[in-house]
């Protein structure tokens, strides 16, 4: 009986690894898998992110926020927010690179920001789709501890550990974290998503978000506006009426007017500011703390990056606390030092002082709200409900201003941190056909058109036009015998083309020479899809020659750059996979060594010396391999150790068999045979 038990306990265990497939390919829905069968239920939580998963058809909803991000998925008819590996329902939109070059995303990245400020990247969503020379970019450079540099294409990029990264690439790291959070919960690989953007994002910024999704291995099924997504979440329970969504988040502000009727969500108008949010509130408070310390101590902290990072975190914490208390203490010991010794910062901040510091920012929300109401053609009394979305709407002064603007107290019917992700998941359900009773009709936030004679901006599609939409207009040449026409595609609301944003340009060539404005008829067609992305084509009606352009941005990422970033994402993912792989295999190895040594101690005197030596050598080799990061070598040494220890069972089984037959003769064969057992795998 004992021998059979020993044989079962020493049964050779498998330490299997499945092949690693491409982790970040645009067409692939495969995720690297690693599942050690030896790890029991106790370690299942560790193994789960890298266990084999079937391909899932779910479309997850992701709110890629400036400060925090959130992911949700449909469960039946309702969206569910998914907790991340730290147990939180939102994830900080922070990416960091430590001294070893390892990538950290979310809470781990945020925790180490104080000691590693120059390599910790936060708020990079505000840089997405922006040029380095943009005044807003130049302003942001003065407020962040990391470097903002000029990319090879003229866009604003960031630098960490001596490497340059596109803000799109940083967004992809965060999207990857959201994707993995969903996969860990669902137990399936995910490659489809609906991602939200600020309603006032332009074409270049929307394209950058799609590129970020591609780098993260996601097929972005739809880009939808954040306030629209929040309204979807609010109205999914058959609520109807005219709704205003006031969305003040970490980096952007949007306001939208929607009409909800019989499951149809029709956006009437939208407006906003892509550079107004919680980051600006933090910066205002940060500047106050720096000036106060300089006034009292005579020391300027604005050049001390470590001190600034501590001040920034203290400012964010104070801002949050003042939403529920009338005052808070900011205490930062050893913030700096001079010849007289260490210096400490101790300031008591009242809510009224905070409101004074940020009042100019809150006031900036008034005009977009008024313009949105005007564009929607509705009056204040027509608005049935005002929804608050975004963490900054928890600030009492913001709620007070909203009440003043709309003449009614705002509703708190949605979670301001989660409503957008839930709405995105609902849109995913609509696209998949799981949710049939809801229909979303969104709008384009800004006018689109081309430059015509005299530098005039000629609109083809007005702002707040329901999308998808397609509009065309016929133009002619501006000079005699003109054989080529340059088409400049613009977005904005100003009358002069030069005052609006240039989205792209292309040439239509091969036009037959003719007097200006007489014969050539050139049809320009603007086609905006449901993502708000525009394709522009120009066609000479006489020759049927046609040229078109899908707007990316004046800079943007090329296909080669995206492919390169996909490969870099694979490398980062592989490093993370290896680290977790080693962690779990370490548990496996320790457990195996303990079991082998226990068996060897018990049966050492009953087996040949060469078997004992072989086992001891195998254990020694396995311990040595554990000190490396060579997974293949570790697996080989583990297999060798299991093979060596199995010889104990073989020798004991042989000895037990002979003894049993001899004993059986002495006992007259009266002993029942030892029962045989078959292991049942559950």
UniProtKB/Swiss-Prot annotation:
Question: Keywords in UniProt for this one?
Answer: ATP-binding, Mitochondrion, Nucleotide-binding, Stress response, Transit peptide
For this protein's source organism, the top of the classification is:
Eukaryota, Viridiplantae, Streptophyta, Embryophyta, Tracheophyta
Q: Which GO terms describe its biological process?
A: chaperone cofactor-dependent protein refolding; iron-sulfur cluster assembly; protein refolding
Where does this protein come from, organism-wise? Solanum tuberosum (Potato)
Superkingdom is: Eukaryota
Where does this protein reside within or beyond the cell? Mitochondrion
The answer, when asked if Endoplasmic reticulum is one of the entry's keywords, is no
Transit peptide limits? 1-57
Name listed for the protein in its UniProt record: Heat shock 70 kDa protein, mitochondrial
Any one Gene Ontology cellular component term annotated for this protein: cytoplasm
* Cited InterPro entries: ATPase_NBD, Chaperone_DnaK, Heat_shock_70_CS, HSP70_C_sf, HSP70_peptide-bd_sf, Hsp_70_fam
Gene3D superfamilies xrefs:
1.20.1270.10, 3.30.420.40, Actin, Chain A, domain 4 (3.90.640.10), Substrate Binding Domain Of DNAk, Chain A, domain 1 (2.60.34.10)
Query: By its UniProt entry, which CDD domains does this protein fall under?
Result: ASKHA_NBD_HSP70_HSPA9
Instruction: Give the principal location in a single coarse category.
Output: mitochondrion
Q: Where is this region: Disordered?
A: 649-682
Q: Its Gene Ontology molecular function terms? A: ATP binding; ATP hydrolysis activity; ATP-dependent protein folding chaperone; heat shock protein binding; protein folding chaperone; unfolded protein binding
């Amino acid at each position: 009986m004992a021998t059979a038990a020993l044989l079962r306990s020493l049964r050779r265990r498998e330490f299997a690894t499945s092949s690693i497939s491409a982790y970040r390919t645009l067409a692939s829905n495969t995720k690297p898998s690693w599942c050690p069968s030896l790890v029991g239920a106790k370690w299942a939580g560790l193994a789960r992110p890298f266990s084999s998963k079937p391909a899932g058809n779910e479309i997850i909803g992701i709110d890629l926020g400036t400060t925090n991000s959130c992911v949700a998925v449909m469960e039946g008819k309702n969206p569910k927010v998914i907790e991340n590996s730290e147990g939180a329902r939102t994830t900080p939109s922070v990416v960091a690179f430590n001294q070893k070059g390892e990538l950290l995303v979310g809470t781990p990245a945020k925790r180490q920001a104080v000691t590693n400020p120059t390599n910790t990247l936060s708020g990079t969503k505000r840089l997405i789709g922006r040029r380095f020379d943009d005044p807003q970019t130049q302003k942001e450079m003065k407020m962040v501890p990391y470097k903002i540099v000029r990319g090879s294409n003229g866009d604003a990029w960031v630098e960490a550990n001596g490497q340059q990264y596109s803000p799109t690439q940083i967004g992809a790291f965060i999207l990857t974290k959201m994707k993995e959070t969903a996969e860990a919960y669902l137990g399936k690989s995910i490659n489809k998503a609906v991602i939200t953007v600020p309603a006032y994002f332009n074409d270049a910024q929307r394209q950058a978000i799609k590129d970020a999704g591609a780098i993260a291995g996601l097929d972005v099924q739809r880009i939808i506006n954040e306030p629209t997504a929040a309204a979807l979440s609010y109205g999914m329970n058959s609520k109807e009426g005219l709704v205003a969504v006031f969305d003040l988040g970490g980096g952007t502000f949007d306001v939208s007017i929607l009409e909800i009727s019989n499951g149809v969500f029709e956006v009437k108008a939208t407006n906003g500011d892509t550079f107004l949010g919680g980051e600006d509130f933090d910066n205002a408070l940060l500047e106050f703390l720096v000036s106060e310390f300089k006034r009292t101590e005579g020391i300027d902290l604005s050049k001390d990056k470590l001190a600034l990072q501590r001040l920034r975190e203290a400012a964010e914490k104070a801002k949050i606390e003042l939403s529920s208390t009338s005052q808070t203490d900011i205490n930062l010991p050893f913030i700096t030092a001079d010849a007289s010794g260490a210096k400490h910062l101790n300031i008591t901040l009242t809510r009224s002082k905070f409101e004074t510091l940020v009042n100019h920012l809150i006031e900036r929300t008034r005009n977009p709200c008024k313009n949105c109401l005007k564009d929607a053609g509705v009056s204040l009394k027509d608005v049935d409900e005002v929804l608050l979305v975004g963490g900054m709407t928890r600030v009492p002064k913001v709620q007070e201003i909203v009440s003043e603007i709309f003449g009614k107290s705002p509703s708190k019917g949605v979670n301001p941190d989660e409503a957008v992700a839930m709405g995105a998941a609902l849109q995913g359900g609509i696209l998949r056909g799981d949710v049939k009773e809801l229909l979303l009709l969104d709008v384009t936030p800004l006018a689109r058109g081309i430059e015509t004679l005299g530098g005039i901006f000629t609109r083809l599609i007005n702002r707040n036009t329901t999308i998808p939409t397609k509009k065309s207009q016929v133009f002619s040449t501006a000079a005699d015998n003109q054989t080529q026409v340059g088409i400049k595609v613009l977005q904005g609301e100003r009358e002069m083309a030069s005052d609006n944003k240039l989205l792209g340009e292309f040439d239509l060539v091969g036009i037959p020479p003719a007097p200006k404005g007489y014969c050539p008829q050139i049809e320009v067609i603007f086609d905006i899809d449901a993502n708000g992305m525009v394709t522009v084509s120009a066609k000479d009606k006489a020759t049927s020659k046609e040229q078109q352009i899908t707007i990316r941005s004046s800079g943007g990422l090329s296909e080669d750059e995206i492919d390169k970033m996909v490969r870099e994402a694979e490398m980062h993912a592989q490093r993370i996979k290896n680290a977790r792989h080693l962690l779990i295999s370490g548990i496996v190895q320790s457990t195996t060594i303990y079991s082998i040594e226990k068996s060897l101690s018990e049966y050492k005197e009953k087996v040949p010396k060469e078997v004992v030596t072989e086992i001891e050598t195998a254990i020694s080799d396995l311990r040595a391999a554990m000190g490396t990061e060579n997974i293949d070598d570790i697996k080989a040494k583990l297999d060798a150790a299991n093979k060596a220890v199995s010889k104990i069972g073989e020798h004991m089984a042989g000895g037990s068999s002979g003894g049993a037959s001899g004993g059986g003769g002495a006992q007259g064969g009266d002993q029942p045979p030892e029962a045989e057992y078959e292991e049942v795998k559950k």
